[in-house]
Amino acid sequence: MKMQSPKMEQEEVEEERMRNKWPWMKAAQLMEFRMQALVYRYIEAGLRVPHHLVVPIWNSLALSSSSNYNYHSSSLLSNKGVTHIDTLETEPTRCRRTDGKKWRCSNTVLLFEKYCERHMHRGRKRSRKLVESSSEVASSSTKYDNTYGLDRYNESQSHLHGTISGSSNAQVVTIASLPSARSCENVIRPSLVISEFTNKSVSHGRKNMEMSYDDFINEKEASMCVGVVPLQGDESKPSVQKFFPEVSDKCLEAAKFSSNRKNDIIARSREWKNMNVNGGLFHGIHFSPDTVLQERGCFRLQGVETDNEPGRCRRTDGKKWRCSKDVLSGQKYCDKHMHRGMKKKHPVDTTNSHENAGFSPLTVETAVRSVVPCKDGDDQKHSVSVMGITLPRVSDEKSTSSCSTDTTITDTALRGEDDDEEYLSLFSPGV
């Protein structure tokens, strides 16, 4: 039996006391306890807790069965204020990209992120559509609230910085206003605004140089046609060609494309504004000034109708039938249907002074001559002449005002002849 020092014996006694007071912890529990103590030291020092120390604690909280322990531990260990059990992720180191159903990415997340390297920035580039190569040049205009600048090219930054550093007070250069600018022949005149961030040693802000010039493009390969530009005082600086030597064909094409597109939009708006009856949307289709399909001074798209048979009468029954006769010259209907329905608008007024007397205004003008045998002493035959007999008014309740005048006269004349026969029968010999 080995002899132990009094100090070692005292330590063993203390260990036995601790064993009796506290139960033994497992190896995993002891490791977790040490990690928690290390996390506490980070928090006490005011430093950010490393990710590899927090993840095992999250896993242990998720696998734990005690809800109270989960609640208190999550509220203590989370520096973002996580107080609910549902917010805890069962696999915090796994990427959260899913398809909305069962699939989930199995890659490991990045440090302090929720997604892996593959799915980290997914979907950001979909917000802008890639139309043409020129749209990429024009897309940077919205970033600085100006048209496209040359800030992407490193050479332009070096040249601009070397030129502007000489005179820091000159912030805006307008070449068109300077007397030294010379002109060229057959040149398009666009405008260009160049936005550039200068070095912090010169200026901490942004210097905008608006350049509107007369002669920008003669050909695609042509150089700048602007003379020497004095920036301040009597000093002479390099020309615009040396100012921006890296102006490429791509930039020139972008400027020309923007100018042509603007002119095209202006031309279309003028066409719509000045549109009249004879100038419509569809070329080759012109409307008559008197047509009902077109109103003067405005163009209605729903009023445009194409007639397959322009020379045919347009009278229809509203379904399938249509008149087959030819129209009159300069009209839409034939001679039969031209004035149909016009008399219905003005009904004939038959009321006059003869209605009060009960007699018809019509009088039989024809002389009715008949030979009536009369018996007298001499057995002579006398001829009786009946002329201008005023006929009583015959009212036909069934007749309407739309009937023609000829029909009314005929009906009245027929009824008048019947009355004449009754009147002449009085002179017959049998009476």
UniProtKB/Swiss-Prot annotation:
WRC domain residues are 89-133, 307-351
Location(s), subcellular: Nucleus
All copies of domain QLQ, residue ranges:
24-59
Q: Which SMART domains does the record associate with it?
A: QLQ
Give the main localization category.
nucleus
* GO CC aspect terms: nucleus
Residues forming the motif Bipartite nuclear localization signal are: 94-104, 122-129, 312-322, 340-345
Query: Is Transmembrane helix tagged as a keyword?
Result: no
Q: Tell me, what is one Gene Ontology molecular-function annotation carried by this entry?
A: ATP binding
Q: Does the keyword Repeat apply?
A: yes
| Induction, as annotated | microRNA 396 (miR396a or miR396b) negatively regulates growth-regulating factors (GRF1-4 and GRF7-9).
Any GO BP: leaf development
Keyword terms: Activator, Nucleus, Repeat, Transcription, Transcription regulation
The tissues where this chain's protein is expressed are given as: Detected in the shoot apical meristem (SAM) and in young leaf primordium.
Where on the tree of life does the source sit, at the highest rank?
Eukaryota
Q: What does this protein do?
A: Transcription activator that plays a role in the regulation of cell expansion in leaf and cotyledons tissues. Component of a network formed by miR396, the GRFs and their interacting factors (GIFs) acting in the regulation of meristem function, at least partially through the control of cell proliferation.
Copy the domain comment.
Answer: The QLQ domain and WRC domain may be involved in protein-protein interaction and DNA-binding, respectively.
Please state which protein family the record places this protein in: Belongs to the GRF family.
Q: Report quaternary structure and partners.
A: Interacts with GIF1.
Q: What is this protein called?
A: Growth-regulating factor 9
What species was this sequence derived from? Answer: Arabidopsis thaliana (Mouse-ear cress)
